[in-house]
A protein has these predicted regions:
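Short, charged, low-complexity loops and linkers
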Residues: 2-4, 114-125, 174
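An amphipathic alpha-helical interaction segment
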Residues: 123-177
Length: 177
């Protein structure tokens, strides 16, 4: 079903711009540089199609395959480039990543410390990536469809970002996150 009253919707003061959008879709060709994506915001990047070559901070460089989720904190050294044509959805966060009204990533780190006798497991040499479960694949598929149709108001973006965080908290363990 097409979006109704599209002109009214697009003329609204709350219609998201490239600068204000909390979600953006990227359909990129081979060897496209994406190194500035986390310059002003932290980014949760879902790779729906293709591959990315990524270096993040002091971690070992690695190739990210489709179906993976990667967190790119703001202002951490990051270089990224597409391998072949790629499609991904980026979710931008200004502050902490709120996983629900009760937890954010810092709270989860505290919970993991409590479970492990106040010690975190030793850091990996490779930055973490998360395989996307079918519930998140469905979420991103619906989100992509809605954005393609032009449903792009800031209220929609905020609600979908809250939904994403609740799904992450609901379908993944503390250690996974």
């Amino acid at each position: 079903m097409p979006l109704h009253n599209k002109k009214d919707h697009m003329d609204c003061v709350y219609y998201a711009t490239d600068e204000s959008a909390l979600f953006r879709q990227y359909r990129l060709s081979d060897s496209t540089d994406i190194s500035d994506i986390n310059e002003s915001h932290s980014v949760l990047l879902y790779l729906a199609e293709g591959c990315l070559q990524i270096t993040l901070g002091n971690f070992t460089s690695r190739t990210i395959e489709h179906g993976m989720l990667v967190f790119l904190p703001k202002n951490i050294g990051f270089t990224g480039q597409t391998i072949g044509s790629s499609y991904f959805i980026a979710s931008f966060f200004a502050g902490r990543l709120p996983l629900c009204n009760k937890y954010d990533l810092v709270d989860l780190q505290y919970q993991v410390r409590q479970r492990n006798g106040r010690h975190l497991p030793p850091p990996s040499r490779q930055f973490p990536q998360l395989a996307v479960c079918e519930e998140l694949v469905a979420f991103y598929s619906d989100l992509s469809h809605n954005l393609d149709e032009g449903l792009n108001c800031l209220h929609f973006h905020r609600l979908k970002q809250e939904e994403l965080c609740i799904l992450l908290r609901g379908y993944y363990s503390l250690e996974d996150l």
